Curated annotation (Swiss-Prot):
It comes from Oryza sativa subsp. indica. InterPro entries: AP2/ERF_dom, AP2/ERF_dom_sf, DNA-bd_dom_sf. GO terms for cellular component: nucleus; transcription regulator complex. GO terms for biological process: regulation of floral organ abscission; regulation of flower development; regulation of seed development; response to cold; seed abscission. PROSITE patterns: AP2_ERF (PS51032). Residues 1-12, 19-36, 420-429 have a biased composition (Low complexity). A motif (EAR) lies at residues 283-287. Keywords: DNA-binding, Nucleus, Repeat, Transcription, Transcription regulation. This is APETALA2-like protein 5. Expressed in seedlings, leaves, stems, nodes, sheaths, panicles and young spikelets. Accumulates in the spikelet abscission zone (AZ) via a positive regulation by the transcription factor SH4. Pfam families: AP2 (PF00847). GO terms for molecular function: DNA-binding transcription factor activity; transcription cis-regulatory region binding. Signal peptide: none annotated. Residues 111-167, 203-260 bind DNA.
Length: 460
């Protein structure tokens, strides 16, 4: 039998490298790993060195010492056997730690926070996030100017504790301006200070280059309109001043302007004009002269008409119909008018006189009476008020009834006249206060004869 201990394989086997390696080889494969590493020292030799590394070192009983040297513990998980890198030290490492941001990474295209370079426009634009929205702060020629705009907006939006690109001491002067403006107004200030305006825009607020080549001033969102046109100007400064004046007039001294509002203080003072008493006095004089002239015309015209009417009433042909315009409700302002139509001579006119509302008084009652008889006035009777009878000559009744084949109705006949003038005045006053026209009804031609009334004829 072969002796296994004296076998050639056993004699050719190399001796173990160390006791620990022999023990680890006897253990399970999960506790050890075998890596073939070429020998760098001898390039010509093709010898293979087997290196066994232990993942979990055995605990040393009865002591807390290190079971393995420090370099062995450091290389537990480094299967390739490379040495650990040396930590970087120096001012560069400390600067990198101090610049670490708690609000996220900076812009990829700029070293400053909140600044981005746009290839299409060729300028540096600044943005800031507020309430989940990105707010545009303007376009600038340099990244440094855009970074300063971002810093000012960040201080306004987030306070002095905000993360900014430069030190807070550089913005001491801007802190005073921020306190007087809202967020929206301060953003407009930053945009006006930017230099990256599109074509046709101006750095002044409310100013735009018109297509005719002049500068247009306008104010937007006023009184429900989209914008209010203020005019065209030759220069930007003139248009900006026009906008400032309009803004101060509409919004007062707190309006946002392009220039210092103090330069417009003298333009909005009230002009040296007449006092209020003098203005009221002039107004009274103008109104008084107008009213006096009208009153004089009314009074003078009334007197002339009365004078002419009196003569015409006595000498005119009584067969001609008369049109009376009597309005004694305004007797305090003007006299009674009696207008006689001398040019009209129409014997076939209807007998209904154009007297629809005749308030009467005893004084005026006697002007239309002849010998005190209320029924006749020179052979011609009139319907006056509601208390006097009306009669016309039969010749006129016959002519009116057959005028052109047309039948004209006779005027109504009121109740019998009162016994005295006082009763007649009372009845007419009641009709005058009601302001209703007298009652007019159409009756047959024989109504007067059936009721016992006869027309009075003019004596020949």
């Amino acid at each position: 039998m072969w002796d296994l201990n004296d076998s050639p394989a056993a004699e050719a086997a190399p001796p173990p490298l160390s006791p620990s390696a022999d023990d680890s080889g006897a253990s399970s494969s999960s506790a050890a790993a075998v890596v073939e590493i070429p020998d760098d020292a001898d390039d010509d030799s093709a010898a293979v060195v087997v290196v066994t590394r232990q993942f979990f070192p055995p605990a040393v009983p009865g002591g807390g010492g290190d079971p393995a040297p420090g370099n062995a513990r450091a290389g537990w998980l480094r299967l390739a056997g490379a040495a650990p890198p040396v930590a970087a030290t120096g001012p560069a490492a400390s600067a990198a730690v101090s610049k670490k941001s708690r609000r996220g990474p900076r812009s990829r295209s700029s070293q400053y926070r909140g600044v981005t370079f746009y290839r299409r426009t060729g300028r540096w634009e600044s943005h800031i996030w507020d309430c989940g929205k990105q707010v545009y702060l303007g376009g600038f020629d340099t990244a440094h100017a855009a970074a300063r705009a971002y810093d000012r907006a960040a201080i306004k939006f987030r306070g002095v504790e905000a993360d900014i690109n430069f030190s807070l001491e550089d913005y001491e002067d801007d802190l005073k301006q921020m306190s007087n403006l809202t967020k929206e107004e301060f953003v407009h200030v930053l945009r006006r200070q930017s230099t990256g305006f599109p074509r046709g825009s101006s750095k002044y607020r409310g100013v735009t280059l018109h297509k005719c080549g002049r500068w247009e001033a306008r104010m937007g969102q006023f009184l429900g309109k989209k914008y209010v046109y203020l005019g065209l100007f030759d220069t930007e400064e003139e248009a900006a001043r026009a906008y400032d004046r309009a803004a101060i007039k509409c919004n007062g001294k707190d309006a946002v302007t392009n220039f210092d509002p103090s330069i417009y203080a003298g333009e909005f003072e009230p002009p040296a004009a007449a006092t209020g008493d003098a203005a009221e006095h002039n107004l009274d004089l103008s109104l008084g002269s107008s009213a006096g002239s009208k009153r004089g015309n009314v009074d003078g015209g009334g007197d002339d008409e009365i004078t002419g009417g009196g003569g015409g009433g006595t000498g005119s042909d009584q067969r001609v119909p008369m049109a009376f315009d009597l309005d004694w409700q305004t007797a305090a302002a003007r006299s009674t008018k009696a207008k006689f139509d001398q040019n009209s001579n129409h014997p076939q006119m209807p007998p209904v006189l154009q007297v629809t509302h005749l308030p009467f008084s005893p004084r005026h009652h006697h002007q239309f009476l002849s010998n005190g008889d209320p029924g006749t006035a020179g052979g011609l009777s009139l319907t006056i008020g509601a208390g006097m009878a009306g009669h016309w000559p039969p010749q006129q009744q016959q002519g009116w009834g057959n005028a052109g084949g047309m039948s004209w109705p006779l005027p109504p006949h009121p109740p019998p006249p009162p016994t005295n003038a006082a009763a007649a005045a009372t009845a007419t006053a009641a009709a005058a206060s009601s302001r209703f026209p007298p009652y007019i009804a159409t009756q047959a031609s024989t109504w007067l004869q059936k009721n016992g009334f006869h027309s009075l004829t003019r004596p020949t």
